[in-house]
UniProtKB/Swiss-Prot annotation:
Gene3D superfamilies: 3.30.300.30, N-terminal domain of ligase-like (3.40.50.12780). It is an enzyme of class 6 (ligase). Disruption phenotype: Fails to produce pneumocandins or any new compound that might correspond to a deacylated peptide core or free dimethylmyristic acid. The gene is gloD. ATP binds at residues 211-219, 352-357, 436, 455, 553. Residues 282-352 are annotated as: SBD1. Pfam families: AMP-binding (PF00501), AMP-binding_C (PF13193). Acyl-CoA ligase; part of the gene cluster that mediates the biosynthesis of pneumocandins, lipohexapeptides of the echinocandin family that prevent fungal cell wall formation by non-competitive inhibition of beta-1,3-glucan synthase. The 10,12-dimethylmyristoyl side chain is synthesized by the reducing polyketide synthase gloL/GLPKS4. The thioesterase gloN/GLHYD exclusively interacts with gloL/GLPKS4 to maintain turnover of the polyketide side chain. Belongs to the ATP-dependent AMP-binding enzyme family. PANTHER family: BCDNA.GH02901 (PTHR24096:SF422), LONG-CHAIN-FATTY-ACID--COA LIGASE (PTHR24096). Pneumocandin B0 is the starting molecule for the first semisynthetic echinocandin antifungal drug, caspofungin acetate. Pneumocandin B0 is a minor fermentation product, and its industrial production was achieved by a combination of extensive mutation and medium optimization. Inactivation of three of gloP/GLP450-1, gloO/GLP450-2, and gloM/GLOXY1 generates 13 different pneumocandin analogs that lack one, two, three, or four hydroxyl groups on 4R,5R-dihydroxy-ornithine and 3S,4S-dihydroxy-homotyrosine of the parent hexapeptide. Pathway: Mycotoxin biosynthesis. This is Acyl-CoA ligase gloD. It comes from Glarea lozoyensis (strain ATCC 20868 / MF5171).
Length: 568
């Protein structure tokens, strides 16, 4: 059985362009969505108040591309795109995405590197992508220089992204800045017009997006211009059923180096929204900007929503009355956290979604038009999904869990230098194997909603019963003394496997209780809310922080390594 989007949202607002760059598509007005002036603020730096309109962005993209063309010797109409790869490794900046669009104007591809990557990871990814230039910021300059030098990169091709952050020990760096490149480009002659006669948006790559599952194995997803434009249109279509004629002020705290954050920046710019962009996440600074700019939409991850839910004092310290919608992705939103935030802010619409870097990005999204508590929403238009049982047969009924496969015009073509065979990632008909176990349920309106059960490789069997760790984790983070938690499977002679919880203690609640007593309290809490296969007993360990990947997912293989090390 093939699951699709609801009957009221079957097609996208307009065709996906087949001969256009994603930046040009986003920047041009006249889509028929919202009547927004080209001089209205499109992106604002939360720290300095500096803003860019679409007119400013278009000017900067043009000037940047001219400067880079002169320095690198590239132009759009000549050369292989995979020989024109530029790495961007920086904290958020209002220049970040326009920079990527300037690189696209030269026929180049942007490799997005996460700021928390180690020097060895940076070197591995730069080498694999055959990087020819790097844009980075002062805090990351040293490791980027080391990585680029290690792959014999030209040091003069390392450029600086300026950030509005104070420096503890100011360091003078002579690298050319984006501001200098824009200024220099203003005096250069225009580049040759883009020859798009043979350009295919489906085939031409826009971004190299590193991605890793809980295995920790780094891969690079090859994302085309059409992939990004498709998901912009899919999200815009779903969103248009409730907000077709209005623009919003939105909060930009998601890393632009991550697919979710990058998509949001493209999506809100296309809609005509104004995004208040933060270089990095700081809860109090973020909430202050919500108050200052009267932000309407928050794009968050579950851990931040959980932190808000467990710190109600924040709602007294800051005026958050402007907020109407909270969109969350990157990981599952525990139902207990959703209920807690709803009690604090019943006027907020909480809209969970589901997606992958490989599907760039969003596959399902909760529309105010169709709700189902605990779900990740309905499939977006043009997204198809299948569920396979243990025998590989298609599940044909609602309410039955199976391995989730998806197909969409936004799904990547393949991984770069694929170490995994394509038939491991995709089936013979082009369906992407997500690695997630999911189910579909119908709400009272008859719309099919997607529920993510857990990662396939994380689900444990206790006495033959499948136990998803995410369900235990959802209850753990609802405990007042728990800030964060991750659950893994351990071997058990009688049950086969049992859950083992790694818990980060709250620094504000029940701090006077010793670890033994708190373990007993948490264990009793789980026993009172879940059935016997989910019980933790004494399988609880307190740690300072849950190790996580760049996109906020728990690295459970590292937690399992801790168990092996401690038992050795």
């Amino acid at each position: 059985m093939v699951f699709t989007s609801p009957s009221w949202c079957q097609d996208i607002l307009m065709p996906i362009p087949n001969n256009e760059l994603v930046g040009e598509f986003v920047m041009r007005r006249g889509h028929g969505l919202n009547d927004v002036s080209e001089d209205s603020p499109s992106s604002v730096c939360a720290y300095t108040g500096k803003s860019y309109s679409i007119r400013d962005i278009r000017h900067n993209v043009k000037s940047l591309s001219k400067s880079l063309s002169q320095i690198l010797g590239w132009d759009f109409n000549h050369g292989n795109p995979e020989d024109k790869v530029v790495a961007v490794c920086s904290l958020n900046s209002i220049d970040y995405v326009p920079l990527t669009w300037a690189i696209h104007r030269l026929g180049g591809i942007c490799l997005l590197l996460h700021p928390t990557s180690s020097a060895s990871e940076l070197e591995t990814l730069m080498r694999k992508a055959n990087c020819k230039a790097v844009f980075t910021c002062k805090p990351l300059m040293a490791q980027c220089q080391a990585a680029f030098t290690a792959i014999n990169g030209d040091p003069s091709n390392i450029f600086l992204v300026e950030l509005p952050l104070p420096e503890e020990q100011p360091v003078k760096i002579s690298n050319t800045t984006i501001s200098q490149l824009i200024a220099d480009g203003e005096g250069l002659p225009d580049l040759q017009p883009l020859d798009l006669q043979d350009f295919d948006s489906k085939e031409r790559l826009a971004y190299f997006c590193p991605t890793s599952g809980t295995s920790g194995f780094l891969k690079i997803a090859k994302v085309s211009h059409a992939n990004v434009m498709a998901n912009i249109l899919q999200c815009t279509t779903m969103d248009s059923y409730t907000t077709a004629s209005q623009t919003d002020v939105t909060l930009g705290i998601l890393p632009l180096s991550h697919a979710y954050g990058l998509l949001v920046q493209h999506f809100v710019t296309f809609r005509g929204d104004c995004i208040i962009l933060h270089p990095k996440f700081d809860m109090q600074i973020a909430l202050k900007s919500v108050q200052q700019y009267r932000i309407v939409r928050l794009y968050l991850v579950p851990t931040i929503i959980g932190a808000l839910a467990t710190n109600p004092i924040l709602f007294k310290l800051f005026d958050l009355s402007s907020v109407k919608r909270v969109i969350t992705g990157s990981a599952s939103l525990p139902e207990q956290v959703s209920k807690a935030i709803n009690q604090l802010c019943p006027e907020w619409e909480i809209n969970p979604g589901y997606g992958l870097t490989e599907s760039f990005v969003c596959m399902s999204w909760t529309s105010p038009n169709s709700q189902y508590p605990g779900s990740t929403g309905c499939l977006l238009p043009l997204v198809e999904a299948r569920l396979l049982d243990a025998d590989g047969s298609d599940i044909t009924a609602h309410g039955q869990a199976g391995d989730l496969l998806v197909r969409s015009p936004s799904v990547m073509k393949e991984y770069l230098d694929d170490d995994l065979k394509r038939d491991v990632t995709f089936d013979s008909d082009g369906w992407l194997r997500t690695g997630d176990v999911a189910t579909f349920k119908q709400n009272p309106k008859g719309d099919s909603h997607l529920f993510i059960v857990d990662r396939k490789k994380d689900i444990m069997k206790v006495k033959g019963i499948q136990v998803p760790p995410v369900e235990i984790e959802g209850h753990l983070v609802a405990h007042p003394a728990v800030d964060d938690a991750a659950v893994v499977a351990i071997s058990d002679e009688d049950a086969g496997e049992r859950p083992f919880a790694f818990v980060v203690r709250s620094q504000k609640v029940m701090t006077d209780i010793d670890e033994k007593s708190l373990k007993k309290d948490i264990s009793g809490y789980i026993q009172s809310t879940l059935s016997e296969p989910y019980w933790l007993r004494q399988n609880i360990r307190f740690i300072d922080a849950i190790p996580k990947s760049h996109n906020g997912k728990a690295l459970k293989f590292k937690l399992k390594q801790q168990l092996v090390t401690s038992s050795a």
